[in-house]
Curated annotation (Swiss-Prot):
It comes from Pongo abelii (Sumatran orangutan). Monomer and homodimer. A minor proportion may form homotrimers. Interacts with ZNF541. Interacts with the terminal deoxynucleotidyltransferase DNTT. Interacts with TRERF1. Identified in a histone deacetylase complex that contains DNTTIP1, HDAC1 and MIDEAS; this complex assembles into a tetramer that contains four copies of each protein chain. Component of a histone deacetylase complex containing DNTTIP1, ZNF541, HDAC1 and HDAC2. Identified in a complex with KCTD19, HDAC1, HDAC2 and ZNF541. Residues 56-147 are annotated as: Important for dimerization. It comes from the Eukaryota. Disulfide bonds: none annotated. A motif (Nuclear localization signal) lies at residues 164-170. The lineage of its organism: Eukaryota, Metazoa, Chordata, Craniata, Vertebrata. Residues 197-316 are annotated as: Important for DNA and nucleosome binding. Residues 159-173, 216-237 bind DNA. This is Deoxynucleotidyltransferase terminal-interacting protein 1.
Length: 329
């Protein structure tokens, strides 16, 4: 029996091969030695995983990537809350769209008008998270052309009030920076931009029934700014632009000069002004010019008369403001 037991002892390693544990020598009786290759593989894989985690940590130190990962996680919840807000005001958009369809005609797509209005709301909401230095010049360019009469004056006074507060709150060394000084030099002419609305281009006599006009959206594309809606009004605030009222837009939609836009703003520009800009040094040789986008047209006498009065109002307003400016300072 003893010989048989000695003969069967070499079969012990096969137990280790099957996944068992191999005992140590007699002096180390009771201790387990982890010589199983499977255990070695587990330890090796754990080291590799730790290595991967460390690599991922170092590759995600970019702030933009980290913030975008967080945004991706929160985006579904944000979208749900945004949808809840729009559902709250959807009844107003629906009533307005149906009213537009009743006034303009059945060819108006009410659902499309609602979608465009919602997208416009989201675009305007972006301004809540814009840098203050970028938003203020934009408002300075856009508001004088959109607001009329006393509204423009009140808005200009409202915009001018925060400026002294910013100067008082900043340390003197911050203002003496060369970049800030250059920006300040540009800011002053922009704030006084409405005074430049004079001269031959702002003479109402130049408007008659043979004057050709273009849509502001087409002028934007013709000057190579098609990707940014309304950029032409920001870059060239001195241009005369006329905001079409519902009666004007109804006439424009009938000859198919423009689509029925409902409540969306539609501006008319003088074709001659746009072509003069295209021939100026700022655009001469520009590869993005697409003057074929200028689909010009003439307007009826009643609409031209409204545009003359509007131009005269702006000229008179600017002349009064230029006279009243010295006593205010």
């Amino acid at each position: 029996m003893g010989a048989t037991g000695d003969a069967e002892q070499p079969r012990g390693p096969s137990g280790a091969e099957r996944g068992g544990l191999e005992l140590g020598d007699a002096g180390a009786a009771g201790q387990l030695v982890l010589t199983n290759p499977w255990n070695i593989m587990i330890k090796h894989r754990q080291v590799q995983r730790r290595g991967r985690r460390s690599q991922m940590t170092t590759s995600f130190t970019d702030p933009a990537i980290s913030m975008d990962l967080l945004r991706a996680v929160l985006q579904p919840s944000i979208n749900e809350e945004i949808q809840t807000v729009f559902n709250k005001y959807m009844k107003f958009f629906q009533k307005a769209a149906l009213n537009v369809r009743d006034n303009v005609g059945e060819e108006v797509d009410a659902e499309q008008l609602i979608q465009e209005a919602c997208r416009s709301c989201l675009e305007q909401a972006k301004l809540l998270f814009s840098d203050g230095e970028k938003v203020i010049p934009r408002l300075t360019h856009e508001l004088p052309g959109i607001k009329r009469g006393r509204q423009a004056e009140e808005e200009c006074a409202h915009r001018g009030s925060p400026l002294p507060k910013k100067r008082k709150g900043r340390p003197p060394g911050h203002i003496l920076s060369s970049d800030r000084a250059a920006a300040g030099m540009v800011w002053k002419p922009k704030s006084c931009e409405p005074i430049r609305r004079e001269g031959p281009k702002w003479d109402p006599a130049r408007l008659n029934e043979s004057t050709t006009f273009v849509l502001g959206s087409r002028a934007n594309k013709a000057l190579g700014m098609g990707g940014t809606r309304g950029r032409i009004y920001i870059k060239h605030p001195h241009l005369f632009k006329y905001a079409a009222d519902p009666q004007d837009k109804h006439w424009l939609a009938e000859p198919h000069h423009m689509r029925a836009t409902g409540g969306k703003m539609a501006y008319l520009l003088i074709e001659e002004d746009i072509r003069d800009l295209a021939a100026s040094d700022d655009y001469r040789g520009c590869l993005d010019l697409k003057l074929e986008e200028l689909k010009s047209f003439v307007l009826p006498s009643w609409m031209v008369e409204k545009m003359r009065k509007y131009m005269e109002t702006l000229r008179t307003e600017n002349e009064h403001r230029a006279v009243e400016a010295p006593p205010q300072t």
